[in-house]
Amino acid sequence: MAKDAIAHVRKLDGLQQLLIDHLLETSTISGQLAAKLNLGLVGELLGLMHDFGKYSQDFQEYIKSVTGINPDADDYVLPNGKKIDHSTAGVQWVYRELRKFGAAQGIGDLFGQMLGICIASHHGEGLIDCLDGEGNPKWIERFNKTDELTHLAECEQNANEAVQQKAKELAGENLIRSLLNAVKPILSDQATNNKIKEFYLGCLTRFLFSCLIDADRINSSDFEREAQKEVRRLAEKPD
């Protein structure tokens, strides 16, 4: 399945965009955007893993059998009423890998939450609600969804080797170090209370989220309108 896994089907002529192409290209764009804050590796990982759940057989069978669908709508509903969640697999993979770092201090866990929330939110109108009305952590329900619903194990088995290898390379110490450099001024400021620190961490998360959203939409739009892609590239060139 890995070689021919599909990400999108072009409305104009039915041309298929391979999932590996969408993931690698979105990763590059997201990395370029996040590099503005020296977080290029973070942006790359977000772009690479945002649609990891599309490697599931359920999703591939669905996109190949149905026309006129929106392949970027999360929680597709099959004719039998079954939903297909294609974003949480990437959430769980990133959270699992990053939380290994600085476990005693909870640093990797924090970064895993930040990136996971970005991926979980990438087809909504903004970041998902992280707390419920009583202040309880709502995000953990998404992160802890069963494998039966997220298909993480299946996606790891089906995914292109190039995607998995790059993901493992990105989710390492250099990425953690870049995030540490970004949050250190926030967390080390003794004059700032915790609520303000959490606000600034939220701002950083929103920046990363915007990098992923822009990259995903740019790549999807370029695939739908190839002529537009060339115009955009020309516009990016300096005079």
Feature roles, as predicted:
Residues M1-D239:
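Accessory nucleic-acid engagement/destabilization modules that flank
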